[in-house]
Amino acid sequence: MNLELKEKKIPKKEVLNKLKRLDKRIQIKYPVFKNLREKGYIVKTALKFGADFRVYDKGKKPGKTHAKWIVFCDHESKRLSWSDFSAKNRVAHSTRKKLLLAIVDEESDVSYYEVSWIKT
């Protein structure tokens, strides 16, 4: 991958370094963003919710409907404490979205885990 800026090619490594200065988690978030977009989902920021993304179901329009998922991205090597897991669940519940945990491995492959509430 190269980026062209005013007809000047910028190597992939340099692009990544520039992006890392803007967002230290870009190597975790970008594979998730790319994967969801390739699957046809609309992906928007969820910064105001303290999450990485909000995702709209295929064919749904942001502004006309609510996002289906709120997404938190992490690397497979990162441990998730019960209090962090609970906090993520509270954010999803309070925003009326399903919680989607996106776990990125060493090869930048993404696994998703959807968390839903069960009424008993």
Model-assigned labels for residue ranges:
Residues 39-50:
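Short, well-structured beta-strand/strand-turn elements
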Residues 50-58:
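Beta-rich nucleic-acid/ligand-interaction surfaces
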Residues 1-33, 42, 59-120:
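Conserved phosphate-interacting/catalytic interface
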